[in-house]
Amino acid sequence: MQMGVAVLVLVIACGVVSVLFAIWAIRSVLAADQGTQRMQEIAEAIREGASAYLTRQYSTIAIVGVVVFLAAWYLLSISAAIGFLIGAVLSGVTGFIGMHVSVRANVRTAQAASLSLAGGLELAFKSGAITGLLVAGLALLGVSVYYFILTVWLGYSPSDRTVIDALVSLGFGASLISIFARLGGGIFTKGADVGGDLVGKVEAGIPEDDPRNPATIADNVGDNVGDCAGMAADLFETYAVTVVATMVLGAIFFNGSDILSSVMLYPLMICGACVITSIVGTFFVKLGVNGSIMGALYKGLIATGLLSIVGLAIANTLTVGWGEIGTVAGKSITGTNLFLCGLIGLIVTGLIVVITEYYTGTNKRPVNSIAQASVTGHGTNVIQGLAVSLESTALPAIVIVGGIISTYQLAGLFGTAIAVTAMLGIAGMIVALDAFGPVTDNAGGIAEMAGLDPEVRKATDALDAVGNTTKAVTKGYAIGSAGLGALVLFAAYSNDLAYFAANGQTYPYFADMGPVSFDLSNPYVVAGLIFGGLIPYLFGGMAMTAVGRAGGAVVQEVRRQFREKPGIMTGKERPDYARAVDLLTRAAIREMIIPSLLPVLAPIVVYFGVLLISGSKAAAFAALGASLLGVIVNGLFVAISMTSGGGAWDNAKKSFEDGFTDADGVKHLKGSEAHKASVTGDTVGDPYKDTAGPAVNPAIKITNIVALLLLAVLAHMS
C-alpha cells in the first residue's frame, strides 16, 4: 500500500510539473513584443469578443451544471456530485485559460513573424503548448488527486462503488462542458466564417481578413472559441473519461486481487510519464535548415512518441511489473503484454496522424483532386469534396480495427483500454499542435488588417497553412481516440451490468432482471443499434442547421452594413465589428442547447422507453447497450468523414491563393471562377470540419457515460 501511495504522489507531481511548465510558458509569451498600436487595437477587439462569448457560454452551462450537481447529490452521493463538479470546473478552466493566452499570443506572433519565420513559429507553438499541457496536467490532477482523497484520506477500497461512481461522475462533468463548448464554439466560428466568406469573398470580391469586412473580427474570435477552447474541452474530456473508464475496468476485472491497487494506478502512471515526455518534446520544435514548419512540429511529436515508450516502461516497472498479473475471461494478462498494448496505442496515433495529413494536406492527391474539380464549377467541387470525405474514413477505420483486435489478443478488453490510455497520454503535445492553428490564423488576420508588409503576411500565411493541417490532424486523433475510448466505456457498461446482475442481493433492482443478451437475433438489440446509429446523423444535422442559420444572419448583417455604409468599401467608414460578434454570440448560445441535450437524454429515453414497451429490464438494458454501439460505429464514420472532408475542402481553397495549375497546365489565381467554386466548397466544408464533425466526438462519449451513470443510479436507488 505504501508503494501505491508513493506512485500516486509521483503521478500528482507529474501533473503539477505540467501546470508549472504552462505557467512558465504563459509568462514567456506575455513578455513578447505586441507590435504597433494598430495591431494592438485589432487584438484587443478580438480579445474582448472572445472573452464576452466564453463568459456568456459558461454562464449558460453553469445553470445546467447546478441542476446536474444537485441531481447527482440526490440520486447518487455527495462524492459523485463533487466528482461532477471537479470535472466540469477543470474542463472550463482549461478552455478559458487556453483561450486567454491564445488571444494574447496572436498579436505577438504577428510581430515575431515580421522579424523571422522561426520567431513566429516558436511563439505560436509555445502558446499552443500552454493549452496542451494545461489539458493534460489538469485532467491528470483532477482524476489522481480525487482518487487520492477517496482511497488514501477517506480510506475507501479502490474497487468500492463510491470511488467508481465518483470517478465516472468526474468524467460526466468533463463531458457536459465539452459538448457545449465544442458545439457552441463551432456554431460561432463557422457562422462568422461562412457568412463573412459568402458576402466578402464571393459577392464583394475582397480578400480574407480584409478590415472592410464587418465579420472579420467575429471570424478571428471564432477561431479561438472553437479551435482553442473547444478542442481543449474535447480532449480534456476524452483524457479524463478514458483514464476513468480504464480504472473502472481494472476495478471490475481485478476486484479482490492483490494487484488491484497497482492495476488502478497503472493508467494514471502512464499519463504521468507521458505528460513529462510531452514537456520534453516541446523543446524539439525548432525550424530546421530546410525551413519546413510541418517538419519542425513533427520533430516534437516524434520525440514525444519515442520518449513515451520509455515512459510506458517506467509505468510498468513502478506498478504492474512485467510478469503475469491475473486472468480475465480466461485470458492470462501479463505486464509485458500490457506494455505492448500501450505501444500499439502510440503506433495507432502515429498512423492516424499520417493518414489525416494525407487527406487534408496541400499538394496531396485528395486536396488536389478537389482543386481540379473546382475548375469545372461549383457543383463538381462539392461532389469531389463529398467523395474525398467518404473515402477518408476507410484507412483510419482499418487502423482502429487493427488496434482493437491486436490489443484484445494480447490482454483482452483491459489491453484495449491501456492502448487508448497511451494514445491520450500524449494529448499535451497533440493539443499544442491544434492550439497552434488559431494563433497563426489570427496572426495572419492581424497582419492583414493592420496593413503590415506583404512579406509579413507571407510568413503568417505559411504558418497558417500548416496550422490548418495540424487542426485537421488533431481532429483525426481526437476522433480515433474518442471512438476507442467509447469502446472502453461500452466495455465498462457491459461489465458493470454483469457485476450488478451477479450481486442481485446487494442491488435488488437487478435481482429479477434475468440474463441480458446482446445477440443480434434479439429484436431489441437490433432496434437499439438502429436508434443509436441515428443519433450522430441527427446531431450532425442539427449542428449544420444551426451554422446555416447563424451564417445566414451574418450574411444579412454584412449586406446591411455594406448597403447602409457605402464608405466601408472605400475605407472612409469603419464597419461595426461588435454588432456581428454580439449577433453570433446570441445565436451560438441559443442554438447549442437542444442539440447538446440530445446525446445526454437519448440513453435515458432508450432504457425507459423499451422498459415501458417490453416490461423487461433485460430487454431494456440490451437495447441500451446496443444503442451505445450504434452511436460508436456511426459516430466514428460521421466524425472522420466530416473533419477530413472539411479539411480537404479548406486546403483546396487555399491552393488557389498562390495560384493552382490544373491538369491542362492552366494557372488559376485568386478571384478566378475556379477560386470562387473552391470558396463554395469551403463554405460547405467549414461547418463540416469545425462544428458538426468535432462535436460528434463528445456526443459519442457522453451517451456511453450517461449509460454508466444510469446503472449507478438504479443500483443506488435499490
From Swiss-Prot:
Reactions catalysed according to its record: diphosphate + H2O + H(+)(in) = 2 phosphate + 2 H(+)(out)
Q: Which segments cross the bilayer? A: 6-26, 54-76, 81-103, 112-132, 133-153, 168-188, 240-260, 265-285, 300-320, 335-355, 385-405, 413-433, 472-492, 524-544, 593-613, 620-640, 695-715
GO CC annotations, alphabetized: plasma membrane
* Ligand binding (substrate): K190, K689
Give EC number(s), comma-separated: 7.1.3.1
UniProt entry keywords in alphabetical sequence: Calcium, Cell inner membrane, Cell membrane, Hydrogen ion transport, Ion transport, Magnesium, Membrane, Metal-binding, Translocase, Transmembrane, Transmembrane helix, Transport
Which NCBIfam families would you find in this protein's record? PRK00733.1-2, PRK00733.3-5, V_PPase
Query: What is the recorded function of this protein according to its Swiss-Prot or TrEMBL entry?
Result: Proton pump that utilizes the energy of pyrophosphate hydrolysis as the driving force for proton movement across the membrane. Generates a proton motive force.
Q: What is this protein called?
A: K(+)-insensitive pyrophosphate-energized proton pump
